[in-house]
Amino acid sequence: MKKFILGLFLILGAMSFAAPKFVDMAKVKNADYVIKNEREDILTMAISDDDSAIIISFSTANMSSKEISDLLKSNALHNSENFIATLDNNRAYVNEFEAQGFYSYIIVPKKEKVKNQHTYATYVSSKKISKNDLSKITNAILDEAESYIK
């Protein structure tokens, strides 16, 4: 029995250190997000309702924000998403796509809160978002994502 309990604590301890170190996992676990991918170099979490979904990722990739934005754009194109536009605002690079009646907006902040630690998000909606509304949504999503950074 003692070995079982010790093993359980070792497993739980290993799981708690499986996400990037700059992410506040206690806060993430208390949020309504569903964790989709949890490794030492990346954490991806998602939340959705009837009309939209938000996917937030934290990564330790050794790339610039622009390189990450371009890579995510390339990956989306390979997944048969139709590229619509790149929208550049003061805070983030935003790539807009359409696929199967849904619009997705890949958001990569230009400046990272922690050096060499990246945050990026995808907002998916059944409706095309106006540029003005997209700016507000981008700021809200990035504020939300950054609230999970230590």
Q: Language-model segments: which ranges?
A:
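Sec-dependent N-terminal signal peptides
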Residues: 4-14
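Short N-terminal segments immediately surrounding and downstream of signal-peptide cleavage
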Residues: 19-41
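Stable alpha-helical elements in mature extracytoplasmic
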Residues: 21-24, 64, 68, 133-141
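Glycine-centered tight beta-turn/hairpin loop motif at sheet-sheet or coil-to-beta transitions
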Residues: 28, 48-53, 99-102
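Surface-exposed amphipathic alpha-helical segments
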Residues: 29-33, 122-150
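A short acidic-to-branched-hydrophobic micro-motif
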Residues: 42-70, 117-125
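Signature of long, low-cysteine stretches enriched in small and polar/charged residues
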Residues: 77-115
